[in-house]
Amino acid sequence: MNETTRTYDVIVIGGGPVGENVAERVRAAGLSTVVVERELLGGECSFWACDPSKALLRPVVARADASRVPGLDPAVAGPLDVERVLAHRDRMSSYWKDEDQAEWLNSVSVDLIRGHGRLTGPKQVAVQTPEGDTVVLTARHAVAVSTGTRATLPPIPGLDTARPWTSREATTADKVPGRLAVVGGGVVAVEMATAWQGLGSQVTMLVLDNGLLERMEPFAGELVTDTLREAGVDIRFNTTVTSLDREGGQDGEVRITLSDGGQLAADEILLATGRAPQTRDVGLESVGLTPGDWLAVDDTFQVTGVDGGWLYAVGDVNHRALMTHQGKYQARIAGTVIGARAKGEPIHDAPWGAHVATADHAAVPQVVFTTPEIASVGLTSREAEQSGRRIEVVDYDLARVAGAHQYGEDYRGRARMLIDTDRNTVVGVTFAGPGVGELVHSATIAVAGEVPLDRLWHAVPAFPTLGEVWLRLLETYRG
């Protein structure tokens, strides 16, 4: 077992999309940089979340959309080619190999050390390599923790022997389970229920709450509920799992006991019950922090409670916005501010300045890839009410937009825009309906840009597109 030492300007622990982008921005500022990664470069999003899940969902959603188009509906009535769908999923996940990411990291002159990195003190990281060697790293300026999150499992009796799916197994399974139970009602739960039901599984959703997608506008979850039920998904609200038992060994069915005393049998069970930070074993105790905690940060991503301003936490691990695109935004901010501080340059930390992540508080976009799609940015009406602002809620039936008529028959959807009446700007938008994911960036620009409604009135939408809903929302507001 060998021990070596190296010194860099910046050390990044975690080589997912966030860590890669921190490293690239820091290197662009002229600082020497190393990424430490214990699994695959590209992280959860590339191999176990965003990419494989959307590859499973795309043919399911595309078939649903095509079935509404006159003339196409008979052509798409049959079952999907599961083998080809899974092969496409494998390609989109690069067959769980990260050579391309490693080549990209090398192309931007960032070093890579494969192994488990742990903080051992201020600006110090020890890496245990797969070969059993130790590499002791010292940072001249900063260490950035970008280790992401892991699935959390509730303490259900029988959990260990039931071998439940988490999101990782749900996105990488090599066959369609005959019966799939999904515990949860959030984004992972509804997307995986959509995907596997569309691929031929009989899905039952066991939901603790009164509805799906409870953090979004109520109509979003209601529309998804209706469509899932029409597709054959059995959704049971106000339901908890009290015990699990997998009978007959590894391939046996799972017996699920429910809070009402009833039982359910499934071939697989997915627990989509939340995320926790990957901080249990990264050496937080060596710098006075608690292992397993989320890392609290300021708007430049310096970790609070650690002296010296050298420790940063970027991406899901800081619990600000658990989405890859927002983590990459944070990475661009963090990498830039680390470079500026290392050079002694002024820090522009006013709202919307170059060195602060103001959008984390005001303009986080999200798309849920179900049928129908859900897209949102900014505040919901519930959040707006809690904020104490004077808000006017503007709703519009998306089915009344000409572009929806072209999209297909029996289009169902809804749009909601929240207006801050004191500032005359948009502070939140939610769309629900087929194809609305591509509308979210226009909404993000309106919210992040704080575009006055009088100016937004001059942004003319093309006819006949779904984007014409912007005009209809503004007309509804203006009266």
Give the role of each language-model region:
Residues 2-16, 176-186:
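Beta1/beta-strand and adjacent pyrophosphate-binding region of the FAD-binding site
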Residues 2-6, 45-136, 140, 216-242, ...:
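N-terminal Rossmann-like dinucleotide/flavin-binding domain of flavoprotein oxidoreductases
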Residues 11-39, 51, 55, 59-62, ...:
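Flexible, glycine-rich terminal cap/loop adjacent to redox cofactors
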Residues 50, 147-202, 235, 285-307:
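Glycine-rich dinucleotide-binding loop and its adjacent helix/turn
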Residues 91-98, 172, 177-181, 187-248, ...:
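Rossmann-like dinucleotide-binding cores of NAD(P)H-dependent redox enzymes
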Residues 160-176, 263-345, 349-353:
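FAD-site-proximal beta/loop scaffold in flavoenzymes
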